[in-house]
Amino acid sequence: MSNSTGRGLQANVLGTFDTVVMAVAGSAPAYSIAATTAVLAGAVGLAGPAALLYCAIPMLGIALAFSRLSRIDVNAGASYSWVGRTLHPFLGFISGWALVISATIFMVAGSLPAGSMTLALFDEGLADNTALSTVVGAAWFLVMLAVVLGGARLTVRAQLIMSGVELAILAVFAVLAVFHADNSLPFDWSWLGFSHFDGVSGFASGALVAAFYYWGWDVTSNLSEETRDSRRTTGLAGLIGVGIVFLLFEVFTIAVNVILSSQQIEKNGANVLAALGEEVWPGWGGKVLVVAVLLSTVATLETTLIQVTRSLFAMGRDRTMPSALGRVHRTWNTPWVAIAVVGGVALVLFVASNALGSVGDILADAISAIGLQIAVYYGLAGLAAVVAYRKTLLKSPADFLLGGLWPLFGAAFMFWIFVESLGELAPAAVVIGIGGLAVGLVPMLWYWRQGSDYYRPARLDASRTVEADYVPVGRPATHAAGHEGLSTDF
C-alpha cells in the first residue's frame, strides 16, 4: 500500500451538518437504549430517567470542555493532546489510552449484538448462538473497517444514510409510545428524582451506566483535522449531539418504565427495544426497531473505529506509540496502518469472546468496564479545559460558568462515579476496566525513555490564543494554514 509518514489527514471534508450527524451516531441512540436499558434497570430500577438526567448535566460540562479546548488545539488525538499539554504528558497518554482501550472493547461488545440482531431478523432462535453471532458481527465490523479505510468522505456518506433511517424510525416509535394506552405503570415524576436510588453507591452505579449511554459524541473532536472551520464546528456539534441524544434517551427510558414490566425488561435484556416495539406496534414493531438498533450498532462501530484509529494516528505521529501508526494512505488520506492494526486486534478479541459466555454476559461486563475508562478520559479533559482557560475565567460570568465551573463540575462528577463504582461492579468489569488502563503504562514508559517530543510539550494556554494548527513533522506550515475556510460540503 502507498503511504507517507509526512502526509496529514484530508482537511475540509466534513461540514457542520456532517459533524452533528457524527456526534449523534457516536452516541448510538438506538443501540444504547437496546443494549443498556436492562443494565441500567438492574442498577437503579425505575430511576433510569433520573440517572440519565443527572448524568446529562455534567456531561454537558465535559462537552463544553471539549468545545473550548478544540478552539485552541486542533488535533486528531483530542484529549490525548489537550491533557498532555495542560496537566502532564503522562496523564495525556493515559487519557488517549483510555479511549483506545474502551473503543477496542466496544468494537467487540458492539459487534456481537450486531450479529445477533442480524440473525434475529431471519430466525430468533439463532440470535442466542454466540458463535454464529460473533461470525456475523465480525463481518459487519470488517465492512465498517473498509468504509473507514476508504476515507472521511465515504465514511460520512455511509453515516448519513444509516443514522438518517435510524433516527426516522426512533421518531415514529417515540410518538407511538407517547400515545400507547395499555401500560404497565402510570408515569411518575418521582422517576426523575432521587427517591428510587439505593443510596449514594446506587446512584453512582446508575451514573456510570448512563455515561456509557452518552459516550461517543466526542468523535467530532477526533475528526477535527478533517473538518471545515473545526475550531467552531467540532465543539458545537458535540454540544448539539449531547442535547439530541439526551431527549431520545429520556423519551425511550420513560416509555420502557411505563409500557414494559420489570419481568419483561429482565427477560429481553439486550432486546428490550424490540420488546417495546412489539408492545406499541404488534406484529411489525419489534422487527422495525431491530432494524433501527442494527443500523445504530453498525453506525457506531464506524464512529468508534474513527475514534480509536485517529487517536492511534496522533500517538504514532508523536512517537508515543510505533511511528508506523502515523502513516497515511496516499489515495484515501486515512491512517491505514492504525486501521489495519485495530482490525487485527479486534478479530482476535472476537474469537476470545466466545469463551466468555453469552452475548448478554459479555455486554454487561463490557459496558461497566467501558464506563470506568470513559470516566477517566472525560474527567481529565474537563480538568484540562479549566487549566487551559484559568487566566480568562474571571473576564465575565459566562467565562467563569462555561469555561470553569461547569467543566470542573463535569470532571469532578466523572472521577466521583469512577471511585464510587469500584466497590459495586463485578470483578470481571473491574479487571477489564482497570487492567486495560494499567497495560498502557508499558508503552507510555517505553516511549518516554525513547525521548518522544510529546513528553516535552508546548503548554496549552488560552490566554495566549494559540492559532496555529497542529503541523506534522515534514508537512509545510502553509498547508496546515489552509485548514479552514474552504468549501467542503457535498
Predicted feature residues:
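Membrane-helix boundary/coupling elements in multi-pass transport proteins
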Residues: N75, A98-P113, V219-T227, G283-S323, ...
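C-terminal membrane-solvent junction of multi-pass transporters and transport-like membrane proteins
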Residues: Q10, L325-W332, A375-A426
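Helix-loop-helix junctions that connect adjacent transmembrane segments
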Residues: T5-G8, G48-P49, G125-L132, L160-V291
